[in-house]
Design a protein with these regions (language model features):
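Positively charged, helix-rich recognition surfaces that bind polyanionic ligands
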Residues: 2-218
């Protein structure tokens, strides 16, 4: 019987390898499509050309291939390490209502989060791994090691929450005692804490929580 837990979080930042790859694919094909669109405009062509359809199909195939490999890598890691539960953080409004600048908003819209989620759900069901989606609001702001209470975001609630720790620079989170932890790990642990799928007291003194392990997908 599997007893270990894997908490998975994909932080939507350019520096994150997974999303950087997706961004690059979209940017490359969008650049080509923009040139084709410019030619169409000059020639007053309104329909989608065969070349546009071809590059769109190629882009979608490449992204789907990458997502499939990413999902397979995650599930294989679970199987190889006797992990029986997978927790995936999500935010229902992270695309619809995000207001973080025009460039970042474009990147958020391009992220095929739902496709990755669906692939993980399918593979987890296939191999008997328990899969749970967990709402993740405030998990990047709260301090895991300080045990901050993590509220659920409500747009009707105007209350401002104060947390023990803070992000002091890109990728690094500082607790109230000055302990430094990788910001992505802090967020992932808070998602796991919010999910309540396991007692996390045994994790507080685990050294590997401070720094994440990077796994190459392709």
């Amino acid at each position: 019987m599997r007893r270990k837990i894997l908490c998975l979080i994909f932080v939507l930042k350019i520096r994150c390898k997974f999303y950087k790859t997706i961004f690059q694919l979209y940017q490359y094909y969008n650049k080509i499509n923009a040139k084709l669109q410019s030619i169409k405009d000059k020639q007053k062509i309104e329909r989608t050309t065969l070349r546009q359809k071809r590059i769109t199909r190629k882009r979608n195939n490449r992204i789907n291939d990458y997502l499939s490999k990413a999902a397979r890598t995650i599930v294989n890691y679970c199987l190889n390490n006797d992990i029986g539960k997978l927790v995936l953080g999500y935010n229902e409004d992270f695309q619809r209502n995000s207001n973080i600048g025009s460039i970042n908003n474009q990147n958020f819209v391009n992220i095929p989060y739902g496709k990755l989620r669906d692939k993980l759900i399918y593979l987890c069901k296939l191999y008997g791994i328990e899969f749970k989606l967990q709402e993740e609001s405030y998990t990047s702001k709260a301090s895991f090691f300080d045990g901050d209470e993590i509220p659920i975001y409500d747009k009707e609630n105007l209350q401002e929450y104060i947390f023990s720790g803070k992000r002091i620079k890109r990728g690094l989170y500082q607790t109230s005692t000055g302990k430094l932890i990788n910001a992505d790990c802090n967020g992932a642990l808070n998602i796991l804490r919010k999910s309540k799928v396991v007692d996390l007291r045994v994790l507080y003194n685990r050294g590997e929580l401070n720094t994440p392990k990077r796994i190459r997908v392709v």
